[in-house]
Amino acid sequence: GGKLLFMSDYLEQQIPFGMYINESIKSGQVYWSWGMDLGTNFIGAFSFYLLGSPFFWLSMPFPSSWYIYIAGVIYLIKYMVAALAAFLWLRRQVNGENAALIGALLYAFSGFQSLNLIFSHFHDVVALFPLLLLAVDLWVQEGRRWPLALSACVSLLTNYVFFVGEVVFLAVYYLVRWLIPDVRRGLRRLPGCAALGALGVTMGAVLFVPSVLFLLSNPRTQQHGVSLLFSKEELLYLVRSMLLPASSMHSPDVLMETHWASCALWLPMGGLVLAVIYCFGAKKRDWLRRLFLLCLLATLSPALNGAFLLWTQSGYRRWFYMLLLLAALAAARVLDVPEAY
């Protein structure tokens, strides 16, 4: 086989941070970090990266000097968990296991994953996200409580910034998937869903509260306000991200200079073609069709796109993995019953 080379943030942040967190925890220096600049809050500095990730904690039994080697193995585990978690959710949405398996692999190896290889902690979030949707479905359909509370807690601990976007998505998902088609059951299950989510947040408060207090002192979090339209170059970049595998973010191309927004909406084996076919073949009131088109519309406007980051002036598209999971489900449904489309 060939060689997979990592660069930029992976070598400058991910590996050094992993080694440093390992050393700090084992030495008991978990309140204040003297190794970052002139010193900073340890939890506030590293809770966005690796501190609360269950994948990172797999490396803790080993010496910090081993992390550079263990990180590659952990990367493989993240892809396996992403595929397994997606399969568990997709399997409930289609009849055939093969279609669910293909959809799970499309999600796990999506363009969003390959584009963000230098940001290894993004893959933690992608791997665990399908479990949140599965937990919501289990609560609504079967009344199972703990999966939702635990998945909310683990997702929050893994990355509180991405969790904010996931809460926004889950609110829209619940509305389109459960409330609109069946108002009575949707309203009956809604208070419990909110309470279980709040319980999960409470359990994750050990990292969440210090992180929020740390962020409040950062002036960049106060920069709100977005425009209504993307530029022509950004729209072309978005369209290309749906049709072709993403190019490297740190290398300029014909459309943009360096572009760190994580704009990638490509699935292996044809991009979003199968998802588009599904939208044309599905009923107009189909929940997946509605939700997919609604999220696709959100990608076209900075105002709607910014809702997943509380309208901060970042311009990031780092919620696209959620849309790609919907696209993977649409593709799985087409492959499950191709004659229907």
Q: What is the meaning of each model-derived region?
A:
Residues 76-92, 98-140, 144-179, 192-212, ...:
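Membrane-embedded helix bundles of polyisoprenyl
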Residues 12-21, 47, 54, 189-192, ...:
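Periplasmic/ER-lumenal interhelical loops and adjacent helix-loop junctions
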Residues 84-88, 131-138, 170-178, 274-280, ...:
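Transmembrane alpha-helices and membrane-interface helical segments
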Residues 1-93, 98-130, 154, 158, ...:
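Active-site lumenal/periplasmic loops and adjacent helix-entry segments of GT-C-fold
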Residues 74-78, 121-124, 159, 163, ...:
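Alpha-helical transmembrane segments of integral membrane proteins
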Residues 91-95, 139-143, 179-189, 279-288, ...:
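Membrane-interface helix-boundary motifs at transmembrane edges
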Residues 2, 64, 142, 178-186, ...:
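Transmembrane helix-loop junctions in multipass membrane proteins, especially transporters and channels
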Residues 4-5, 69, 113-124, 253-260, ...:
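Membrane-helix boundary/interfacial segments in multi-pass membrane proteins
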